[in-house]
Regions:
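Alpha-helical scaffold segments
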Residues: 1-138
Length: 138
């Protein structure tokens, strides 16, 4: 079944909607999109799971809050990029970092002490999810 799904066939409905293979040209398009003047195009690059590290690092410093917010939402964003975003001036960006499942523990510690009550509440909420999982597994 796993091979059938990977080829876009089989009984799994998701198999019909698989993305095309990641190619050098797709990576080049993501790089180009990350440099576009339109922030909506850069947001799309920030949401990509396949962007190269240098793209993620550049987008973490993007002047547009929406671009940085999209990057903070990306579960594939590298830990160092999420650490950078955990210090962002935007409460919205920090809030999305707080609920990203890939954020490293040291960044979560920083966010736990954040000046924003919203960010602090999101950190507590995420911790409660982990506590609930521990109860289920016990």
């Amino acid at each position: 079944m796993a091979q059938a799904v990977a080829k876009g066939t089989g009984d799994d409905p998701v198999a019909s909607f698989l993305s095309p293979a990641i190619t050098a040209s797709k990576i080049a398009r993501i790089k180009t999109m990350s440099l576009d003047a339109n922030p909506k195009i850069r947001e799309s690059a920030a949401l990509s799971y396949h962007a190269p590290l240098e793209v993620y690092e550049r987008l973490a410093m993007d002047p547009n809050e929406g671009v940085r917010t999209c990057l903070a939402r990306n579960a594939q964003a590298p830990c160092d990029v999420l650490r950078t975003l955990s210090r962002d001036s935007s409460e919205t960006v920090r809030a999305f970092v707080a609920i990203n499942h890939s954020v490293p523990e040291d960044a979560m510690e920083r966010l736990r002490e954040d000046t924003s009550p919203t960010v602090q509440k999101l950190v507590a909420w995420k911790a409660s999810l982990r506590d609930d999982t521990d109860l289920v597994l016990a």
